[in-house]
């Protein structure tokens, strides 16, 4: 069953899509160091990220200064919700430099 999932590679490349497994979003040679699930909040122009990848765990935001995002998502803010009762939401768009790619 395909679900809306995302991954982030060691190089800071952000990929998302409807896939069976998070690894289906990786290209040969990619090293994934975090992933989870996503949904679009069109009212507030945001991509909401949450949960974690069973295989790769939660994104390790402290490892990146720049996140490389597909240019299709230009103009959308990116937020990661921990939903664990301990952490505040992580505003990816404010905390990391966003670089767009085609």
State where each predicted segment sits:
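Eukaryotic phosphoinositide-binding membrane-targeting regions
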Residues: 1-102
